[in-house]
Amino acid sequence: MISRVTEALSKVKGSIGSNERHALPGVIGDDLLRFGKLPLCLFICIILTAVTVVTTAHHTRLLTAQREQLVLERDALDIEWRNLILEENALGDHSRVERIATEKLQMQHVDPSQENIVVQK
């Protein structure tokens, strides 16, 4: 650690004595690559983790909203199915069918003595 500081100070003293100009981004990048590899890697990992957390939270919210909509649709279909069952039972009621047959179609009960049985060969 002390050698690093000494090296950095000697560079600074050397650059002060000379008229050489250094670009600040280049100095920062050089310093990061030389002495800050671990913090730089950790910083990149933190940024990637944060982006992943935000993306996951967004997808979770979308899926939760979609699930709620599907639950509402399922409930509506369940109500419609129950109404259709009731309608089927009402329309298939024997007394209703018999009443329609006698009133609208003028059908009558057949006397067993008037029945004809047809046998097909």
UniProtKB/Swiss-Prot annotation:
Membrane topology of the entry: Single-pass type II membrane protein
Claim: Membrane is one of the keywords in the record: yes
Periplasmic side: 58-121
Transmembrane regions: 35-57
Principal location: membrane
Keyword field: Cell cycle, Cell division, Cell inner membrane, Cell membrane, Membrane, Transmembrane, Transmembrane helix
Entry keyword annotation includes Transmembrane: yes
Topological domain spans for side Cytoplasmic: 1-34
GO biological process, one term: FtsZ-dependent cytokinesis
Xref: Pfam families: FtsL
Location relative to the cell: Cell inner membrane
Gene Ontology CC annotation, any one: plasma membrane
Family membership noted in the UniProt record: Belongs to the FtsL family.
Assembly and oligomerization: Part of a complex composed of FtsB, FtsL and FtsQ.
Purpose of the protein: Essential cell division protein. May link together the upstream cell division proteins, which are predominantly cytoplasmic, with the downstream cell division proteins, which are predominantly periplasmic.
Name of the protein this chain belongs to: Cell division protein FtsL
Native species: Salmonella typhimurium (strain LT2 / SGSC1412 / ATCC 700720)
